[in-house]
Design a protein with these regions (language model features):
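Residue patterns forming the tRNA-binding/recognition surfaces of aminoacyl-tRNA synthetases
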Residues: 2-65, 79, 84-89, 127-133, ...
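Carboxylate/His-rich catalytic cores and anion/metal-binding grooves
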Residues: 78-80, 87-135
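Glycine-rich, acidic and aromatic/proline-enriched surface loops and short helix-turn segments
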Residues: 138
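C-terminal accessory/binding modules appended to enzymatic or scaffolding proteins
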Residues: 147-149
Length: 238
């Protein structure tokens, strides 16, 4: 017999600096910051996608420094479109070419404030095999490849139909990272502060950094939308 030493994701309280069992977690309504973020495509078998953007949505902006991949649904239909008109308050830019799930087109346009588009191409997720992107923080030291991977946990309930994957922050993300030999980075210390893996955000607390992350994304022309969502969120019973 052989021994195996590895790791697994656990729920963690940054206040008590301890792991939590499922039975110790209570769920309460919580208002989270939400963001839509652009990832620039550097390599793809879909030639129209190269040098354009894949759009992701997340309720945890603080996990962006931990991003190492994007995930798509193999049998989901995606579209590539060019933005032609936006409303006055939108952060989206006319002329940008963006990829999202076809079924979520209307909800994405309404939320972001896009009023007119031209669809350039439609395709199934399975055609995204071997696609790669830059990290949105590439210009501030995140100079590694972000792989675009197939995953069975991608749904069309909300967002863009593409999931941002941070292998150090959740079970689905971690398992996908292990399966695809991703760099499993945990950029957060036991007390909830960023470590050296988070580059310019070192020392910032993840509970307080969402707007700072969003502002940096906006500065780098990667932020398309900043909003809020009330949803059920885990809390320590202590």
């Amino acid at each position: 017999k052989s021994l195996y030493k590895g790791a697994r994701p656990v729920l963690w309280s940054v206040v008590e600096k301890t792991a939590l069992a499922d039975a110790e977690v209570e769920y309460e309504d919580h208002t989270s910051n939400t963001i839509y973020v652009k990832f620039k495509v550097t390599k793809s078998n879909i030639k129209e996608l190269v040098d354009n953007d894949i759009l992701i949505w997340t309720t945890t902006p603080w996990t962006i420094p931990g991003n190492r991949a994007l995930a798509y649904g193999s049998d989901l239909e995606y579209i590539l479109f060019q933005i032609q008109e936006v409303n006055d308050s939108s952060l989206a830019k006319i002329g940008d070419i963006i990829m999202i799930a076809k079924k979520l087109q209307d909800s994405v346009m309404n939320e972001i404030g896009i009023t007119k588009i031209e669809v350039l191409k439609s395709f199934l997720g399975k055609e995204l095999i071997d696609t790669e992107c830059n990290h949105p923080f590439k210009d501030i030291g995140y100079d590694f490849t972000v792989k675009v991977l197939e995953a069975d946990f991608v749904t069309l309930d909300q967002g863009s139909g593409i999931v941002h994957v941070a292998p150090g922050h959740g079970a689905d993300d971690y398992n996908l990272g292990i399966k695809n030999n991703l760099d499993i980075v945990q950029p957060v210390t036991d007390d909830g502060k960023y470590n050296e893996h988070a580059k310019c955000f070192v020392g910032e607390h993840v509970y307080k950094v969402d707007l700072q992350i969003s502002e940096k994304l906006k500065e780098l022309d990667k932020l398309v939308y900043l909003g809020k969502l009330q949803h059920s969120y885990p809390h320590s019973w202590r």
